[in-house]
From Swiss-Prot:
This is Cytidylate kinase. The keyword ATP-binding applies. Its EC number is 2.7.4.25. InterPro entries: Cytidylate_kin, Cytidylate_kinase_dom, P-loop_NTPase. Its main location: cytoplasm. The keyword Cell wall biogenesis/degradation does not apply. It comes from the Bacteria. Belongs to the cytidylate kinase family. Type 1 subfamily. One of its GO terms (biological process) is pyrimidine nucleotide metabolic process. ATP binds at G17, P18, T19, A20, S21, G22, K23, G24, T25. GO terms for cellular component: cytosol. Keywords: ATP-binding, Cytoplasm, Kinase, Nucleotide-binding, Transferase. It is found in: Cytoplasm.
């Protein structure tokens, strides 16, 4: 059956999935392999939050927030989030920044502005976008949509390892409980619930290495007749 998906000259690969599924790592490596631009949609909200704090813009000042988001200079390179050319990957993980991101995201105009910024990352030669609704909401016409997941136990183990490597203490049972609670919230929310697009490729990475997951995404891309 011939696809009815609208044609766009700039290819997009979307990689959606739950927390700690490895989608960010896979997306960054796929983008690097293909020479594509990279979008970490989750970090985008935190970058906007960090910028609002640095410029003393109140979380309730919707007009100022929208203008700020429109003017932000944001790039993602090799897993690093840059604001005005400076790596702020660690800064945006602060609890205060996360709280501010939640506070500004409640405003409809702010979410609309952030959606526009996400779509603006679509530039030649192509884009790899990772998040939760990239294939369903932001880029419904993406050439390749991947929904990457893993068991809650595997994801908790990965997150625990990441935190320990960064010098943080963590209890794996607490992480597992938090992941399951977040999965339930994300899957049942009214706006853009976490779910695979109808035409997404499902990739369970519970028993896969990062390289194996990347290779599978690239195989799917090649199968579309694209050089990879």
């Amino acid at each position: 059956m011939k696809s009815t998906r609208p044609f766009h000259p700039t290819p997009v690969i979307t990689i959606d999935g739950p927390t700690a599924s490895g989608k960010g790592t896979v997306a960054a490596l796929v983008a690097a392999h293909l020479g594509f631009h990279l979008l970490d949609s989750g970090a985008l909200y935190r970058l906007a939050a960090l910028a609002s704090m640095r410029y003393d813009i109140a979380a309730e000042d919707v007009d100022a927030l929208v203008k700020l988001i429109d003017d932000l200079h944001i790039t993602f390179r090799e897993g690093c989030a840059q604001l005005d050319g400076v790596d702020v990957s660690n800064d945006i993980r602060a609890e205060a920044v996360g709280n501010r991101a939640s506070a500004i995201a409640v405003h409809g105009p702010v979410r609309t502005a952030l959606v526009a910024r996400q779509r603006a990352f679509r530039k030649t030669p192509g884009l790899v976008a990772d998040g939760r609704d990239m294939g369903t909401v932001i880029f419904p016409d993406a050439m390749l949509k991947v929904f990457l997941t893993a068991s809650a136990e595997a994801r908790a183990a990965r997150r625990h390892k990441q935190l320990m490597q960064k010098g943080f203490s963590a209890n794996i049972d607490d992480l597992l409980r938090d992941l399951r609670e977040r999965d339930a919230r994300d899957s049942n929310r009214a706006a853009a619930p976490l779910k695979p697009a109808a035409d997404a490729k499902l990739l369970d990475t519970s028993a896969l290495s990062v390289d194996e997951a990347v290779d599978q995404v690239l195989q799917w891309y090649r199968a579309l007749g694209q050089p990879a």
